């Protein structure tokens, strides 16, 4: 019996990256929000999506008059089986706010918090909201 329990534990943990906290399990067409390094499981698609980080954030701060709205770049990692692919999603360009991985479209819906001119955003404070849908 003990061997069976150990086997099940190993089987369940085999597909997990121990360095990334597991986040929500969501279905297609559901919005989900992740913190940096958090991973969502997309059931019905066989994918996991990790919010890696915000590699740059030049969005115009709230309360400031800017010529351009700016852009933030959200790096994600899509994990399918043992393979993973990195992508950059942009807040300031609707043509680059989504990617297609196989038959699944992953779109960045929102990045919070929005910058203010009076402070900086610590990397761990970011929360990115995504959707995943069939192409």
List each language-model region with its residue ranges.
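Positively charged n-region of N-terminal signal peptides that target proteins for export
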Residues: 1-4
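Hydrophobic helical h-region of N-terminal Sec-dependent signal peptides
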Residues: 6-10
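C-terminal motif of bacterial Sec signal peptides marking the signal peptidase cleavage site
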Residues: 12-15
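Surface-exposed, beta-sheet-biased, low-hydrophobicity segments with strongly acidic/polar composition
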Residues: 17-135
């Amino acid at each position: 019996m003990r061997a069976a329990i150990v086997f099940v534990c190993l089987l369940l943990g085999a597909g997990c990256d121990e360095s990334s906290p597991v986040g929500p399990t969501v279905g297609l067409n559901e919005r989900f929000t992740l913190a940096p390094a958090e991973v969502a499981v997309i059931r019905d698609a066989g994918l996991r999506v990790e919010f890696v980080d915000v590699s740059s954030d030049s969005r115009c701060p709230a309360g400031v008059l800017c010529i351009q709205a700016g852009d933030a770049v959200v790096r994600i990692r899509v994990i399918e089986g043992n393979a993973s692919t990195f992508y950059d999603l942009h807040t300031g360009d609707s043509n680059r706010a989504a990617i297609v991985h196989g038959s699944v479209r992953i779109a960045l819906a929102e990045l919070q918090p929005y910058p203010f001119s009076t402070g900086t955003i610590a990397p761990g404070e970011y929360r990115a909201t995504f959707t995943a849908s069939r192409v």
